[in-house]
């Protein structure tokens, strides 16, 4: 299974991890300076869940993001799946 959420479309993103040194200006310092940057990946918070589908009358095992899980709690599984199908068409 990929690291992409099938319901929200969230996927890994590329970015940088910054190394800083110095004392912040609000702490009466000279300011924070970036001394290095390293490439890294930001991964979505993926969760494997077993959810009950009332339409199919069975459990569905899905690997979804945490934000998709909140969306399912708010709208219901069938509405979220229908919305994802409409988006992909």
UniProtKB/Swiss-Prot annotation:
What does the similarity note say? Answer: Belongs to the bacterial ribosomal protein bL28 family.
Q: One Pfam match, by short name?
A: Ribosomal_L28
Keywords of the record: Ribonucleoprotein, Ribosomal protein
The protein, known as: Large ribosomal subunit protein bL28
Which molecular-function annotations from GO does this UniProt entry contain? structural constituent of ribosome
According to its record, what are the GO cellular component terms? Answer: ribonucleoprotein complex; ribosome
Q: Name one GO biological process term.
A: translation
HAMAP family in the cross-refs: Ribosomal_bL28
